[in-house]
UniProtKB/Swiss-Prot annotation:
GO MF annotations, alphabetized: aspartate-semialdehyde dehydrogenase activity; NAD binding; NADP binding; protein dimerization activity
Top-level division of the source organism's lineage: Eukaryota
Active site: 151 (acyl-thioester intermediate), 247 (proton acceptor)
Record-stated family: Belongs to the aspartate-semialdehyde dehydrogenase family.
Name of the protein described by the UniProt record: Aspartate-semialdehyde dehydrogenase
GO cellular component: cytoplasm; cytosol; nucleus
UniProt pathway annotation: Amino-acid biosynthesis; L-methionine biosynthesis via de novo pathway; L-homoserine from L-aspartate: step 2/3; Amino-acid biosynthesis; L-threonine biosynthesis; L-threonine from L-aspartate: step 2/5
CDD domains: ASADH_C_arch_fung_like, ScASADH_like_N
Subcellular location: Cytoplasm, Cytosol; Nucleus
Organism: Schizosaccharomyces pombe (strain 972 / ATCC 24843) (Fission yeast)
Gene (UniProt): hom2
Keywords: Amino-acid biosynthesis, Cytoplasm, Methionine biosynthesis, NADP, Nucleus, Oxidoreductase, Phosphoprotein, Threonine biosynthesis
Amino acid sequence: MAIKKVGILGATGTVGQRFITLLSDHPEFKIAVLGASARSAGKPYAVATKWKQSIAMPKEISQMSVKACDPKEFSECDIVFSGLDADFAGEIEKSFRDANLVIVSNAKNYRREPTVPLVVPTVNTDHLDVIKYQRQENKLDRGCIITNSNCSTAAVVVPLKALQDAFGPIAQTNVVSMQAISGAGYPGVSSLDILDNIVPFIGGEEEKIEWETRKILGSVNSTISGYELTDNVVSAQCNRVPVIDGHLMCISVKFAKTSPTPDQVREVLANYVSEPQKLGCYSAPKQAIYVFDDSTPDRPQPRLDRNNENGYAVSVGRIRSDSIFDIKFVSLVHNTVLGAAGAGILNAEVAVKKGLM
């Protein structure tokens, strides 16, 4: 397979930096262009950014000249990954698609568009098939927009997908989140607000989980031109907690028909295999869902489990019967890997494998 040249929009931000760490030694994708704001354009990357990752900035990246977020600067790229903030992403990403470029976006702006795939790679890569209709609709032969989910949504939909496939439709889902501060970007939440504290509000977050879950767990329509939302009714309450990385979610599920036992749920989750695994994608986890049994009742924990499978796995524990719903459990996702940049990369890997780009 020929190596794909890729670009990164918002390369100096938190998500952009995570894209760089995950792509710097990727065997199939090579970083060709870094894009950021006008004040960063023209500067060496090492000068333009405040590097906040736990591993060193790759040497070959540090001296790359940052470009403006202009499609002309990215014309050589096969794929452009966007880590842009939603305040800027809408117009810029559309201009890239209109220039016949492939955009894989972490921003919320196009997630609700009828012909734009909203994909968590270990859940619903079949939704990528609608790319063909999106191109037809916009009279493009190559350009398109693909979005990945909100970071917290990923922790919800991966286990729900496995359960839905095994036990049939889910009627109701209740979610209470404990979300890491890196989800707010840099500089993010003030230390005076988060130290010795929990903030029981994250603007827009609950609505994202409630709606995105229904699109992701839904299906492609009969004409492969859009999506049918699932009937699952989702209620979410979101909290910011003093953890750097890793969103922990307490989830309760009521099924429309079958009510499985905790042991049945454990078995289904442990044996779940996603399409990226079947396709042999480079970034695909060997185990999509890590399952903790009753011998480890205090897991998963962000500090101990967020890096399972290099952050591409979801970890699930405390699986129990629920007196109001049917089943309850705790789910953990690395919010900047499977919940952000990693999802975009794995989505692109799947799209390449399927001949969609």
